[in-house]
């Protein structure tokens, strides 16, 4: 492994055995920097990072579990395998070369070629046929990565499923496509469109079940439906059972047209009054609301007329039937009545108004003046109260009532309002 040292050995015989020769030998032993510098390369040869050139060319054997390719590279036979394919396309498709000699049992000792048929090889793309891990370098071998077989023609049918190949053979669709059929290389390209054609008719059969459930849920809840006639559905609810009789596979437009026609016919025929009675308006005009709560500025309607009109509440009413609407609220009878001539009702309404009038509560603490002072500012109070009706409950009616035993609290703010002009 080490280079010979021809320079150190002949030094002693040339000089002979003399003290000078010994000294010369010692001098030569101290001088040989170049000759003694050779052991470090010999020691460095053990280092894997700096192997000497002659050792690179000759390797004793590949590492355990690896095989050496003709290029000198080592590979794992469990991942890669050596195959040799003839460049001539006219000859047989695929060959495999075994080890020349020294192979384990099951591998022939002489180099030979195995003719592998492409169909069995493609149908069984299992692990490489090498049962061993270490093999002596043999004849001409090539390093190829071991991937799934190149021919995706027969294997492409496996992606469709177990019933994919059989269904493809039975369908007459591939013969119709005569353009790509005569070309032998693109059989996998032909196989891809038929699975799409097979799956397309199968897709409509699956969604109807899920769509029927969704359609049934939407039919029970007319709120989220985008149709523009929710009131008609309430009136023609009797015609709903006939809608699910149609198959769920129909388009939504047809179903909408059938529903619309059935609802229009049933609404004109029956037109139940109970539906109108149950249907309450969600929006009320501001004028009607102000008339309902007696807050309309400049309203000169008599108080008794509101209570005299009975009848059901209609959304088109302009205020004549508003008394019935306010009575539909869950409020005490004192607050639902407009007859302020009753002292109890007037007292209750005035107390409710003063809960929200914080100025009046703060200004009630000053001493109350005599009755003559309360009579003078009464008309001024009625005018100002009517001007600010949006913030207070029923102040206009309260100002018209004369000071009585039930209206003991109003004199406080009246005195203040009368004192403001001074």
UniProtKB/Swiss-Prot annotation:
Pfam families: PRR22. Residues 383-400 have a biased composition (Basic residues). Residues 1-35, 306-325, 363-422 are annotated as: Disordered. It comes from the Eukaryota. Residues 413-422 have a biased composition (Basic and acidic residues). PANTHER family: PROLINE-RICH PROTEIN 22. This is Proline-rich protein 22. It comes from Homo sapiens (Human).
